[in-house]
């Protein structure tokens, strides 16, 4: 395991909402929710910290957000402007290193082991980047500094907003032991529920389990979690990373025969895929359905649409059609997955925040 790298994860604080509050003084100090009209279909893209105090969070239906925060200010947002500001932030990053891996408009990994300013301390680089972003753009960012991407990303969320958390190789295992396992990469709702049933709530709980036992209970997730909780991750910062597909899949706790359960899963996946596509500023043209039967036979079916889309309803309709064509209801399903491929950048003026 290479512990000599100096990795920073920068995560802008409530990015879209912060840009709006910066540009519109009337929004400052008020619960601002980006996601469109709460009386129509849509979900929250992001919200200000004032709105978060009421329990509002991203991916929540706007109608639910309105109930939690009746005095909230709802706006559609301006994606083209957020892209412009994101590019300004990346220009600041490039003053320090060319090894930059953007994850979305509002976050990125930076490898500053060999940085352009010859600074020996990654912590000082992170602080200077935070200060520069605030001074030049009037926005705050949180930073995590460590020797690998996994720990740096967790650390950036530790002292939000505008905080910085440094985790050295010597501190890594103790730091990870206190972290809820729901914060670990790859732990979604289904895996979190399995971990909860196993009595695993924190990194410390996770560390008590052997590698074999975790793999037996969680399969490939167990393999990765065993390494992550020990700070073992050698993934490099990849400036050429380009997502070729966006998808979601789940392995059911019990094999499923009911097509309605499968349809419900696809609907949830479509919403999640839509959210990720919009964050990546992409849309796709090919929908892929994956089914794994109880005997571990796996099939994939794909449908190429007439036009590119990032709309959950269109993605779901295509997936549901593939399900009808593929599933007879005679054999139970162990795993179901939905992926959108054939991606290309979205024309920003056509991005629909309201129908996220």
Curated annotation (Swiss-Prot):
Domain of life, source organism = Bacteria
Q: Where mainly located?
A: cytoplasm
Which coenzymes or cofactors are required?
Mg(2+)
- Which E.C. number(s) belong to this protein? 2.7.7.7
Q: Example GO biological process term?
A: DNA-templated DNA replication
Subcellular location as annotated? Cytoplasm
Q: Per its record, what are the GO molecular function terms?
A: damaged DNA binding; DNA-directed DNA polymerase activity; magnesium ion binding
* Positions annotated to bind Mg(2+): 11, 106
**GO annotations of cellular component type:** cytoplasm
Query: Catalysed reaction per UniProt?
Result: DNA(n) + a 2'-deoxyribonucleoside 5'-triphosphate = DNA(n+1) + diphosphate
| Pfam families referenced in this protein's UniProt entry, alphabetically | IMS, IMS_C, IMS_HHH
Q: Which residues form the UmuC domain?
A: 1-188
Record-stated family: Belongs to the DNA polymerase type-Y family.
> What HAMAP family does the record point to?
DNApol_IV (MF_01113)
Complex and partners: Monomer.
Name-wise, this protein is DNA polymerase IV
Give the lineage. Answer: Bacteria, Bacillati, Bacillota, Bacilli, Bacillales
Q: Please name the gene that encodes this protein.
A: dinB
